[in-house]
Amino acid sequence: MNRKAILGAAVLPHPPLAVGKVAVDKKEIIKKTIASFQSLAKEIERLAPQTIVLISPHTNLYADYFHLGSYNEGEKIAWGDFSRFGDAESRVAVGFDEPFIDALAELCQKEDFPCGKLGKKTSFLDHGITVPLYFVQKQYSDFQLVQVGLSGLGLAEHYALGMKITEIAEKLGRKTYIIASGDLSHKLLADGPYGYAAEGPEYDERIMAVLERAAFGEMLDFDEAFLERAAECGHRAFCIMAGAFDGLKVDAKKLSYEGPFGVGYGAALFIPKEKDTARHFLEAFREKEAKKNEERRKNEDPYVQLARASIEHFVNFGKVLELDAKLKEKIVLEKEAYTKKAGCFVSLKKNGQLRGCIGTISPTQENIAEEIIANAISSASRDGRFEPVRVDELSSLVYSVDILSESEAIASEKELDVKRYGVIVSAGHKKGLLLPNLEGVDSIDMQVSIAKQKAGILPHEKVSLERFEVLRYE
């Protein structure tokens, strides 16, 4: 087994305007970024890898699965060009390292890790791949490619994939270089293509500081909601790259940073050094999360305890939790939980991201406690947006329970308040609901628009409106 299979790595952006005849008049503006691509190409030529693992946010992306690039049936070359960016002449072509890809997919299947070749096959390479390769192949072309996509899973899962990539490189004795392709924030300028958000420059400053210090453990601490507001592109790709160096000291070199068009372009190189037991960042992160979850459980509201117990019982045993005397002694609920009826929603989050949310506008069970049990099970097993919750996920879930008041009809949107009131929109037999005080929903227009979308109501359709209040338990 080759313990030095990973020769190095790079973080790079992927602006097509850096390539060939694309936007020739703008190349001087991003000359630092172009110089960084050229520096990378020379570094790769010096190291002479057999395989380049290239991680791209624009490769096929799935909510709960990492896709590894593979050819269309009958093809043996992967390729991409820049015709859609105005340059029909510049192109790249490369072969996939199929033994590496197959070995990685096999390892992931063996370890029940959601990564492999089950996604859509295509020999066409996205620009997250082709932009870096355009520069690399000008200097060095004696390599094969492993194309890695991102997923909707948490940052820790991305980091873990990087560790598995290193494991396969070492097992095969393959001299490997890793490129994490990704722009930084897309929200740097008010007059930029994506507008401005304060989180944009903040993200770029933070991530560049992390990269300069090779402080890879800090990558896992970025809040998911913050990342979304910053509109970053490459953070998950950077986490995969970071995982490839778990347990190793790393020399880092910042190449450049600029954002003249409202999108951050950061570039850095990394060289692995000796082992360092203090840099097992995934292990440390999971220990920290376990302590946080344990503390959270100690302070959970009884309604949340009931939702958690319902899901854990159902996932482990496939049975509905019974409200017997033993349970009532363990989870002490207010009297009204057994005497009153109300609609409720149970929401699940994992790694800061929604993992399930189902509820009832009006009560369907004998009491609030039974309503929570029923909706908790539905959230974990019947939310069509997600696969059913697995046993190994239970310890990572964060719960909230919303108990709804009776709704009241209102005449217009002026009577709404996104923090205080949830909204119900109706058009004919279509009805949609959105809870109040949701992260990222900061206007009445957005609240109503999302509720319409959930109901399958077109944006221009007239709707009747109802509002309601909730008591949220966490």
Predicted feature residues:
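Structural motif
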Residues: 51-53, 177
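Polyanion/phosphate-binding surface patch
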Residues: 65-68, 341-355
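Active-site beta-strand/loop microenvironment that shapes enzyme catalytic pockets
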Residues: 149-203, 348-368
